[in-house]
């Protein structure tokens, strides 16, 4: 009798957890394990480690013909960053052909450019990006629920989604930060749960899980492209050019849920068509509101956050000709916490993210044709707008610090920007498909629609690298760079019996010092400038220049 009661309780607990999240999309394929069945605990009972999230996504790609999985980067701590492609079996079998057709439809520079008036022939590409801030963890749990629903649900509604879309699920953009946070909250979780905001579970020690291994905010790195997680994601964007990019976040515990539109009078990126903000985001917002109304969750929009800085993950989706948006869920910062509105639990935050993610797919499918037309107009207008402008490009020289110039050109090339080279002169034409990204990198904006905005107010990468560049009203000649392998010739170093000198003006000096010290080579540094007669003549050396003695 006790065993029967226990089994009934287990069954009811499992049934409740499933009904709480995705009852709406039943029935499900019994041959595919739910996240709870795979992990061994209900979603929201624990914070799930990144390796288990990857394992579940791998499992789904192995058992279903509606999914395929790819790795796009590896974090500093060796964790794989992956995305799961979900669509109908027919589309999964032809995914590479569909990807290339999508690019041919939207990009006028493509050799197979399709001037088609039938966007209905193409699926909408939806990029769902989760957990760029590691201690905003609800979204990665929701990613597993979303993947399971799209793959396992037998509902006609979900079938329609898969017939008309390619859904790219990136469950953990910042795996190192997530696991740092996961370790903290699971370690300090109490039984019973402690909802006191002062409890250790809800108060990570610095630096917390927000940032990556080197404590960098990956949601400020998209233009800079410094870290491997971001560089892989940038390449992902240019492989797919999604129509919709959704970025999932959390905010302060004493809040509710935010979705677009942004602040009504907020500053917006001046290079992005207003249609993005004033039309599409309004329509998406109506879908999000309806979805949260159905489950009785509170929300707000138009009162916070803005689109000033083009280096957020959501903003980069705009530069791809898509609609980039974000969700902000009030965080439980653990498993349960008391707020001014009552208790907030981890499962509650997960459900809101899950419902909003599914409504992103729904809205994208409903607006598919409009989104496809907008993206095609976006890139076509890039070329015509560039023709109308006085500035035809930006020029700069190799300069004294060749490695710094090389690093800057690397940033241009990872953003799929064309760079022309003529001896030691470089030219970046504005007339190219990523015209708006070129403007974002070179232009210096000093006027904004609002005096109050979220954070970053300056982002010119050209100025970040201190590049001495000029705008040009004339087109320039040159050969387009394919790679950086032979950007400049490295001078041969003559053998010395006394010492070697390295001027500190070079961008790669820190890397050189690291390499020399790790090789047990003695290195001295200059505390003031000096000149010296070398085999190449009299040469000035600056502060911090390196002296490597051959013998002492």
Which residue stretches match the model-derived regions?
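Intrinsic-disorder/low-complexity accessory segments
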Residues: 18-137, 144-165, 220, 226-228, ...
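Acidic, His- and aromatic-enriched active-site or binding-groove loops in soluble protein domains
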Residues: 187-214, 219, 265-282, 322-323
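Sec-dependent N-terminal signal peptides
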Residues: 3-13
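Active-site neighborhood of phospho(di)ester-bond hydrolases with catalytic His/Asp-centered motifs
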Residues: 128-130, 170-172, 245-248
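Active-site-proximal loop/turn and secondary-structure-junction residues that shape catalytic pockets
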Residues: 173-175, 250-252, 331
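Substrate-binding cleft of carbohydrate-active enzyme catalytic domains
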Residues: 179, 203, 209-213, 225-237
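Proline-aspartate-enriched helix->loop->beta-strand connector
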Residues: 237-251
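Carboxylate/His-rich catalytic cores and anion/metal-binding grooves
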Residues: 147, 164-190
């Amino acid at each position: 009798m006790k065993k029967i009661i226990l089994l009934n309780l287990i069954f009811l607990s499992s049934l409740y957890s499933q009904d709480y999240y995705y009852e709406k999309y039943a029935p499900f394929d019994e041959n595919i394990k739910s996240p709870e069945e795979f992990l061994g605990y209900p979603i929201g009972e624990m914070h799930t480690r990144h390796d288990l999230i990857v394992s579940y996504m791998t499992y789904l790609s192995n058992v279903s013909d509606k999914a395929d999985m790819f790795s796009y980067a590896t974090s500093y701590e060796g964790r794989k960053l992956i995305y799961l492609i979900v669509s109908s079996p027919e589309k999964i079998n032809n995914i590479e052909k569909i990807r290339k057709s999508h690019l041919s439809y939207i990009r006028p520079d493509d050799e197979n450019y399709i001037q088609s008036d039938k966007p209905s022939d193409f699926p909408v590409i939806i990029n769902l990006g989760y957990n760029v801030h590691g201690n905003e963890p609800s979204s990665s749990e929701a990613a597993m629920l979303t993947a399971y629903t799209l793959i396992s649900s037998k509902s006609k509604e979900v079938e329609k989604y898969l017939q008309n879309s390619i859904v790219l699920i990136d469950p953990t953009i910042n795996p190192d930060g997530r696991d740092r946070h996961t370790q903290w909250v699971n370690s300090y979780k109490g039984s019973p749960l402690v909802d006191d905001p002062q409890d250790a579970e809800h108060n990570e020690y610095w630096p917390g899980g927000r940032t990556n291994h080197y404590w960098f905010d990956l949601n400020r790195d998209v233009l800079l492209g410094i870290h491997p997680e971001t560089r892989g994601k940038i390449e992902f964007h240019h492989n797919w050019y999604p129509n919709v990019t959704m970025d999932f976040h959390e905010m302060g515990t004493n809040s509710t849920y935010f979705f677009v539109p942004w602040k009504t009078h907020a500053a917006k990126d001046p290079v992005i068509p207003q249609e993005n903000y004033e039309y599409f985001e309004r329509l998406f917002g109506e879908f999000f509101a309806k979805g949260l109304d159905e489950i009785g969750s509170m929300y707000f929009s138009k009162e916070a956050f803005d689109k000033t800085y083009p280096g957020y993950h959501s903003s980069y989706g705009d530069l791809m000709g898509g609609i980039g948006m974000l969700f902000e869920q009030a965080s439980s910062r653990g498993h349960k916490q008391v707020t001014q509105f009552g208790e907030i639990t981890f499962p509650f935050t997960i459900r809101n993210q899950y419902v909003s993610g599914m409504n992103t797919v729904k809205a994208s499918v409903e607006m598919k044709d409009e989104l496809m037309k907008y993206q095609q107009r976006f890139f076509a207008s890039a070329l015509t707008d560039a023709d109308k402008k006085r500035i035809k490009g930006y020029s700069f020289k190799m300069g004294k610090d060749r490695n710094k110039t090389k690093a800057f050109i690397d940033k241009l090339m990872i953003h799929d920007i064309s760079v022309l080279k003529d001896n030691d002169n470089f030219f970046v034409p504005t007339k190219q498909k990523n015209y708006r990204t070129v403007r974002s990198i070179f232009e210096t904006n000093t006027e904004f629609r609002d005096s109050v905005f979220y954070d970053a107010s300056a982002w010119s990468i050209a100025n970040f690298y201190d590049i001495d560049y000029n705008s040009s009203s004339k087109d320039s000649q040159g050969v387009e760079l394919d790679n950086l392998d032979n950007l400049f010739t490295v001078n041969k170093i003559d053998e010395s019996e006394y010492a070697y000198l390295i001027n500190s003006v070079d961008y790669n000096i820190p890397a050189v010092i690291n390499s020399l010290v790790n090789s047990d080579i003695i290195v001295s540094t200059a505390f003031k400038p000096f000149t010296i007669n070398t085999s190449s003549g009299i040469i000035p050396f600056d502060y911090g220049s390196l002296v490597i003695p051959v013998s002492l």
